[in-house]
Amino acid sequence: MPRLPNSEDPPERPDFITNIINGLERYNPEAVGTLEQYLTTQCEERFCDCNANRTLLKLYQLNPDRIKDEVITNILVKAMTLFPSPQFSQALHLLSPSALSQQSELSEAVSKLRALNNQLEGAQYARFWATIESDDLYADLTTDIQGFEEMVRLRIAVLVSQAFREVQLSLMEQWLGLDEAPLKTFITEACGFKIEGDIVQIPKNPDNEAKKAEIREDVNVEMFSRVIRRAWEEVA
């Protein structure tokens, strides 16, 4: 089962991006193009650098003439794949309220992405896949993000593995938005789970392992004597 990646300081981040994030270059309008190209790299190579993307959104705040709607939606989609986390909300709060309040393509796109993110955050996975299929605009919004659906499915699988040892195959079908052969291939090959009949067997891990809870309460002699004394007083 793959581990959840480090999205704040990913190992893929090059030194020149670190210099922009941590230095005075983060206020330089000329850094916009560099950060936009870095976002393209993230989309193509399936990793996310939320720190760098927030830096880009802050530069957009300072330089509204440089704003690109497609870049904003790509940042939001990348943040969405990190559910459950505050990354989507943090990116959303860096957007210009005036841009979102207008009846524009960006406003509509952000509204749709917010709805998708809410479904993922609320573990409404079946509803998420149904929503994705309901409007071609969702495909347009996620087309730049290589492996978007696979990343979401892997994230769901990780969360399921943290909570369960056994899951009905029919439930996994709904949660992963797959059926029959593709579903079984993903479960066994991408996730490393086993299928026995209509049950998905999930390997034991520190999160889903049943642990015996031990509750101890220390009672000293003085506390015990007070209880006995109070009982005698009530009788008397």
From Swiss-Prot:
Main localization category: cytoplasm
Listed GO CC annotations: eukaryotic 43S preinitiation complex; eukaryotic 48S preinitiation complex; eukaryotic translation initiation factor 3 complex
SUPFAM superfamilies according to UniProt: ARM repeat (SSF48371), Winged helix' DNA-binding domain (SSF46785)
UniProt domain PCI: residue ranges: 48-218
Tagged with keyword Translocase: no
GO MF annotations in UniProt: ribosome binding; RNA binding; translation initiation factor activity
Record's subcellular location: Cytoplasm
Short name of any one Pfam family annotated for the protein: CSN8_PSD8_EIF3K
GO biological process, one term: regulation of translational initiation
Assigned keywords, A-Z: Cytoplasm, Initiation factor, Protein biosynthesis
InterPro entries: ARM-type_fold, CSN8_PSD8_EIF3K, eIF3k, PCI_dom, Transl_init_fac_sub12_N_euk, WH-like_DNA-bd_sf, WH_DNA-bd_sf
Quaternary structure annotation from Swiss-Prot or TrEMBL: Component of the eukaryotic translation initiation factor 3 (eIF-3) complex.
Family stated for the protein in its record: Belongs to the eIF-3 subunit K family.
Role according to the record: Component of the eukaryotic translation initiation factor 3 (eIF-3) complex, which is involved in protein synthesis of a specialized repertoire of mRNAs and, together with other initiation factors, stimulates binding of mRNA and methionyl-tRNAi to the 40S ribosome. The eIF-3 complex specifically targets and initiates translation of a subset of mRNAs involved in cell proliferation.
HAMAP family found in the cross-reference section: eIF3k (MF_03010)
Protein name: Eukaryotic translation initiation factor 3 subunit K
